[in-house]
Amino acid sequence: MDQLATQIDGKPASIPAVETSSSLEEAKIIYNLPFNDLLFRAQQVHRCHFDANAIQMSRLLSIKTGGCPEDCSYCSQSARNPTGLKASKLMEVERVLAEARKAKEGGATRYCMGAAWRNPKERDMEAVVAMVEGVKALDMETCMTLGMLTPEQSERLADAGLDYYNHNVDTSERFYSEIITTRTFEDRLETLANVRDAGIKVCAGGILGMGETVEDRISMLVTLANLPVPPESVPINMLIPIPGSKLANADPVDPIDFVRTIALARILMPRSHVRLSAGRTEMSDETQALCFLAGANSIFIGETLLTADNPGEDHDTALFRRLGLKPMELQSSEAGGCR
């Protein structure tokens, strides 16, 4: 890590693979490097493990919307936030699979299914398992986000062939209780451990723009990087202020700060896919381009992201053409060694 923070006469130091644990102080030094140096180093690390011009394409479907009992301050789906969102029942399996087929036709290689639950009930597990098995039969990667999981539920999803489980930590441990009180930071880490122990890959990241400090953002990434095995996928979301939610009037995130966070995620977790997730509709094409330069190599495609707007596929296709980017093929979605 010391090599990464070394700078001599403005010239960047050599870039070792960052495979060891990271401290908050080391991460702060890296984050605060001159912007050009930070992006240069992040791009070097990125090219060491991935095709720098390939972007992994995922599609996210809400299979059960609204009515969640949690009190997450940012969320349109919390029953405690008067956002006007109507709750729905769990979607039928065949409808989910029909949407998955459309996603594959649109270029997605990973299909993510999200349910607004505190945790899945046993009565719903059979349908959830059938969804995983059905999507796997389409030769797509599968991901689910269903709330907290027990070890037994994790094992059942693993047996069905689930590739990834998403469970974000959202923010730093210090700031966490300012955003959510109905489950603890440790609860989230426990679910991540259950998923990992079952052999499912982990997808875990957070949200920027909830009133946290820059140090909170850095701390969140250090927590993820220092898990026994870092997440294979790290979604970085920009808050979408939802009318009726507690964060409806939150101040926007500075785009340069957002790009710095992407770069730090890439350097601290060099083998992870760093996903430019919610909030892309609020980003300029130039900001997104800087994020890709900083090491982001995954996006959600489609016009909606759970209940939020997302750039349309035509816009993403045009942006990729302008930047010379290409969809990542399924067989190349694993990180390679330093080349």
UniProtKB/Swiss-Prot annotation:
UniProt domain Radical SAM core: residue ranges: 53-271
Cofactor entry: [4Fe-4S] cluster; [2Fe-2S] cluster
SMART domains assigned to the protein according to its UniProt record, in alphabetical order: BATS, Elp3
Cofactor notes: Binds 1 [4Fe-4S] cluster. The cluster is coordinated with 3 cysteines and an exchangeable S-adenosyl-L-methionine.
Coiled-coil zones: none
Single Gene Ontology BP annotation: biotin biosynthetic process
Pfam families xref list: BATS (PF06968), Radical_SAM (PF04055)
Keyword set includes Membrane: no
Involved pathway(s): Cofactor biosynthesis; biotin biosynthesis; biotin from 7,8-diaminononanoate: step 2/2
Catalytic activity, EC: 2.8.1.6
Recorded GO MF terms: 2 iron, 2 sulfur cluster binding; 4 iron, 4 sulfur cluster binding; biotin synthase activity; iron ion binding
Keywords for the protein's UniProt record, in alphabetical order: 2Fe-2S, 4Fe-4S, Biotin biosynthesis, Iron, Iron-sulfur, Metal-binding, S-adenosyl-L-methionine, Transferase
Entry binding sites for [4Fe-4S] cluster: C68, C72, C75
Residues that, per the record, bind [2Fe-2S] cluster: C112, C143, C203, R275
Top-level taxonomic group: Bacteria
Known catalytic reactions: (4R,5S)-dethiobiotin + (sulfur carrier)-SH + 2 reduced [2Fe-2S]-[ferredoxin] + 2 S-adenosyl-L-methionine = (sulfur carrier)-H + biotin + 2 5'-deoxyadenosine + 2 L-methionine + 2 oxidized [2Fe-2S]-[ferredoxin]
Function: Catalyzes the conversion of dethiobiotin (DTB) to biotin by the insertion of a sulfur atom into dethiobiotin via a radical-based mechanism.
Membership in a protein family: Belongs to the radical SAM superfamily. Biotin synthase family.
Assembly with partners or alone: Homodimer.
Protein name: Biotin synthase
Species, as recorded: Agrobacterium fabrum (strain C58 / ATCC 33970)
Phylogenetic placement of the source organism: Bacteria, Pseudomonadati, Pseudomonadota, Alphaproteobacteria, Hyphomicrobiales
Chain's gene name: bioB
